[in-house]
């Protein structure tokens, strides 16, 4: 019997750049399939940007056939207009997944950072570095846009929440990176 396979799509919503990452999981082993950004800066009209988000997310879903979507929740430190636009962008990405019957899980930015680095206040660079080490991503595959690794981080966070030893055993959550390494020595070298 082959190990269970699934594909997790992670999304970091944005109205200028929207990051995404695709994670292929076989059994309990994740592997990077793809990551990238959807560039929206050339569109002046917000509604055209929303259509572009829907079209590109739908295209990625049709290309990679994810089983689940993990999406970062909007950060509440921005102004009201920014929050409204970001919420619309997130909603359109979610609608694209729902149109293809893909279940969605939303994670707070702090929760994603905590899951990846053990520190809910980690920088984008720290998150990217930890993902690169954990998934063994070669330097040439790393993108300069941190939105891509933020999207991938949402997928990896979802993997940890649904596939890790604590998810299977119903035990307590991993508290930090050291705790994760101690519980998962086979995942880190």
Curated annotation (Swiss-Prot):
Biological process (GO) annotations held by this record are:
DNA recombination; DNA repair
Note accompanying the cofactor annotation: Binds 2 Mg(2+) ion per subunit.
Could you say which EC number(s) this protein's record lists? 3.1.21.10
**Cross-referenced InterPro entries:** RNaseH-like_sf (IPR012337), RNaseH_sf (IPR036397), X-over_junc_endoDNase_Mg_BS (IPR020563), X-over_junc_endoDNase_RuvC (IPR002176)
- According to the UniProt record, what class of enzyme is this? hydrolase
The UniProt entry, under Gene3D superfamilies, shows: Ribonuclease H-like superfamily/Ribonuclease H
| Molecular function as annotated in GO | crossover junction DNA endonuclease activity; DNA binding; magnesium ion binding
SUPFAM superfamilies hit by this protein:
Ribonuclease H-like
> From which domain of life does this come?
Bacteria
**Cofactor names:** Mg(2+)
Q: Where in the cell is it found?
A: Cytoplasm
The Swiss-Prot or TrEMBL record describes its family as follows:
Belongs to the RuvC family.
Q: What does this protein do?
A: The RuvA-RuvB-RuvC complex processes Holliday junction (HJ) DNA during genetic recombination and DNA repair. Endonuclease that resolves HJ intermediates. Cleaves cruciform DNA by making single-stranded nicks across the HJ at symmetrical positions within the homologous arms, yielding a 5'-phosphate and a 3'-hydroxyl group; requires a central core of homology in the junction. The consensus cleavage sequence is 5'-(A/T)TT(C/G)-3'. Cleavage occurs on the 3'-side of the TT dinucleotide at the point of strand exchange.
Q: Which NCBIfam families would you find in this protein's record?
A: ruvC
Return the protein name. Answer: Crossover junction endodeoxyribonuclease RuvC
